[in-house]
C-alpha cells in the first residue's frame, strides 16, 4: 500500500513539474482593438537572438513598439516594394514578441509578424512561427526600446 501511494505521488509530482515547464515557455496572449500579440517569456528558447541576455517584454513595451510600428513602419528600407500593402493591413497581422538585451545594453524586441488568416499557422501562442517563402504574409522587424527606433525589416520572399 505504501509503495502504491509513493509511486502515485512520484507520478503526480512528475506530471506537475512537466506542466510547469511547458507553462514557463508558453506565450501570454495580449489582444487589443489594433493588434493581436503573443509575448514570449525569456525562458522560451529561440535561435533568432544569439548570445544575448533575454527578458520578458511587458504590456507597456508592446504598446510602445506598436506605436512605433504605426508611426515609423513606412520609413523602413524595403527592397520588396510591398511595405505599403503590409502597412495598409497591419491589423490583419498577428505578432510574436521576443525580448533581448544587446551587448551595449539596449533592450530590443524581435517582432515576428504573420497574416492572421493563414491556415498553416498553428500553435502561434506556443511556438515561434517560421516559414520559408510566403511573401508579405510573413515578416519580422526589430524595435529598440532604448532608442525608440524600428530597424532590420525582413519581408519573406514569394514562393516560386
Predicted regions and their residues:
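Bacterial Sec-dependent N-terminal signal peptides
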Residues: 1-24
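Short, surface-exposed beta-edge/turn micro-motifs
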Residues: 8, 107, 137-138
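Surface-exposed acidic loop/strand-edge motifs in secreted or periplasmic proteins
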Residues: 21-123
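C-terminal partner/receptor-binding element of secreted or periplasmic proteins
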Residues: 134-160
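Generic structural motif
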Residues: 4, 12-15, 116-118, 146-148
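Short consensus segments that form the blades of beta-propeller domains
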Residues: 128-133
Amino acid at each position: 500500500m505504501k509503495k502504491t501511494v509513493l509511486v502515485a505521488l512520484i507520478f503526480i509530482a512528475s506530471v506537475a513539474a512537466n506542466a510547469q515547464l511547458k507553462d514557463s515557455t508558453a506565450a501570454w496572449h495580449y489582444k487589443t482593438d489594433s493588434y493581436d500579440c503573443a509575448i514570449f517569456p525569456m525562458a522560451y528558447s529561440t535561435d533568432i537572438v544569439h548570445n544575448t541576455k533575454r527578458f520578458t517584454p511587458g504590456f507597456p513595451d508592446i504598446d510602445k513598439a506598436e506605436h512605433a510600428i504605426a508611426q515609423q513602419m513606412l520609413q523602413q528600407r524595403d527592397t520588396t516594394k510591398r511595405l505599403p500593402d503590409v502597412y495598409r493591413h497591419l491589423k490583419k497581422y498577428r505578432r510574436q514578441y521576443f525580448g533581448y538585451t544587446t551587448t551595449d545594453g539596449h533592450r530590443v524586441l524581435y517582432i515576428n509578424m504573420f497574416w492572421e488568416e493563414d491556415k498553416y499557422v498553428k500553435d502561434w501562442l506556443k511556438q515561434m512561427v517560421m516559414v520559408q517563402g510566403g511573401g508579405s504574409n510573413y515578416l519580422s522587424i526589430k524595435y529598440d526600446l532604448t532608442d525608440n527606433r524600428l530597424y532590420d525589416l525582413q519581408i519573406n520572399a514569394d514562393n516560386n
